[in-house]
């Protein structure tokens, strides 16, 4: 396990709270062991979401707060049981004083890490079985922390699947990170919204969501994104990009995909 000083030094360098960096350290060690997740019913635990962007797809990315998975070909309970094996391996490799899976109202990781403390902190874990998934890839964790184990591949959404779900999420909720993630996916990864639009539409319909509601929902959310931008994104980045610039660029990509009127 890295020292408390190593965590606070990186927090100072990145301009975020040390607790955010410690959580990232724990997440990285958990993700690095995902190859061990083998549900006994033959299902596949597939890593997804913004945390997958940070640890798999984009080296310089925002900090994340939780873990999201989809189970393909299996049920939630065996997948969560297999995830317990992942945590045990992460705990042993990193020599963490405490790392356990709790499953009361919903699954979560409880941990005590390099910063210490009398009480464990928590990371939310979401495991879905109702997602429409068309492709998965096998990737290894990026070398974000110096004491991670040897990288072995595991199942994860490709960037296009994540982008399509981010489009659907804009219809479903108001979270600034969805807008930020679309911004980075289009600008830095080269995801084409025009190419993933049919996938987004299929994902939306699979959840009984009308994809044609996207333009109105997007416009309805802009003011709320703006009010919350600095505070919400400040939990993930020291210096969030200017909101107006992000919206301008995302709008351009959405118009190119005919998801917004020209």
Question: Where are the regions a protein language model picked out?
Answer:
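Active-site glycine-centered loops adjacent to acidic/histidine catalytic or metal-binding residues
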Residues: 50
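Structured mid-to-C-terminal alpha-helical surface segments
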Residues: 1-46, 55-67, 71-262
């Amino acid at each position: 396990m890295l020292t408390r000083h190593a965590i606070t030094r990186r927090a100072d360098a990145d301009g975020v709270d040390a607790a955010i960096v410690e959580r990232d350290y724990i997440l990285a060690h958990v993700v690095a062991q995902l190859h061990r997740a083998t549900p006994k019913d033959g299902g596949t635990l597939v890593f997804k979401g913004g945390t997958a962007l940070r640890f798999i797809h984009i080296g310089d990315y925002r900090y994340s707060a939780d873990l999201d998975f989809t189970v393909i070909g299996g049920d939630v309970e065996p997948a969560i049981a297999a995830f317990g094996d992942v945590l045990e391996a992460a705990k042993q490799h990193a020599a963490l004083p405490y790392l356990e899976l709790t499953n009361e109202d919903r699954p979560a990781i409880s941990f005590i890490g390099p910063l210490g403390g009398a009480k464990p902190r928590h990371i939310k874990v979401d495991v879905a079985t109702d997602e429409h998934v068309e492709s998965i890839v096998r990737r290894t964790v990026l070398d974000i922390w110096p004491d991670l184990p040897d990288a072995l591949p595991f199942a994860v959404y490709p960037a296009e699947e994540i982008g399509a779900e981010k489009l659907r999420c804009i219809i479903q909720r108001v979270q600034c990170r969805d807008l930020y993630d679309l911004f980075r996916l289009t600008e830095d990864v080269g995801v084409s919204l025009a190419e993933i639009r049919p996938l987004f539409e299929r994902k939306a319909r699979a959840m009984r969501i009308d994809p044609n509601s996207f333009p109105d929902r997007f416009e309805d959310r802009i003011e709320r994104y703006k009010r919350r931008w600095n505070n919400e994104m400040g939990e993930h980045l020291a210096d969030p990009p200017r909101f107006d610039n992000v919206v301008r660029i995302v709008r351009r990509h959405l118009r190119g995909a005919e998801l917004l009127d020209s």
